[in-house]
Amino acid sequence: MENKGLCDQIAISDMSERRMITILGPTASGKTDLAVHLASYLKAEIISADSRQVYRGMDIGTGKDLGDYTVDGHVIPYHLIDICEPGTKYNLFRYQQDFLDCYENIRKRKVQPILCGGTGLYIEAVLKGYSLSPVPQNPELRMALADKSLEELTVILADLKTKNHSVMHNKTDIDSCQRAIRAIEIETYNLSNPVKERSCPPIDSLIIGVNIDREERRRKITSRLKSRLANGMVEEVDGLLKSGISAEDLIYYGLEYKYVTEFLIGNITYDE
């Protein structure tokens, strides 16, 4: 097994005071492969920290690759994948609650939990015990922001984060105007409704960062994108649109879903 040496090192490291193992890294770095083999080695269970893999039916574009969760014929238990319908606005607050339910259940069974994913904000919220509360929509604020450009919204968001001393930095906040407006809505709410106590305790974890040569990573990303397109990415998005999921919602999910949707609704060409 390619990761056996690292698995050996982790297994013999001092985990007596560690309640969890966290594996993180950029796209196409191999973190899922490491997590799966480590889980097999330790008889552990994986908790996903991916903001898009929570959605059912969004398989190719999110790179679920659920077949990879089988090692030597044994399926590694995984959690927080395929837990809600596309179009649902799954958020950080809900993830934190869902994570805690999974984590406590796994620990209660005296099994080692492994947190793995590429959504840094989800991982940070769990490890640091962010104090979160559900933020209601603010129709008046949304209306006031509706005509502003993404650049203008980015400036407003940066100012609010400064005022809030916010550490919740997430690049996807400024992927689109819709995301930026929601982020502004959250920061505006937090400015007026500060939470003084954490809603959950921080979790002590062994953190493993997976890295990869930049050129190799770029090659893998390009290869993976071509593979996804060849294996039905466009058809997957078309099916989601035909099922009633709005183009706006799919664009909200970013990355491949954004561009394939833009292609299907005629905003860009296939080559673009």
Regions found by a protein language model. Give the residues of each.
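Phosphate/pyrophosphate-binding catalytic cores of soluble transferases and nucleic-acid-acting enzymes
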Residues: 1-272
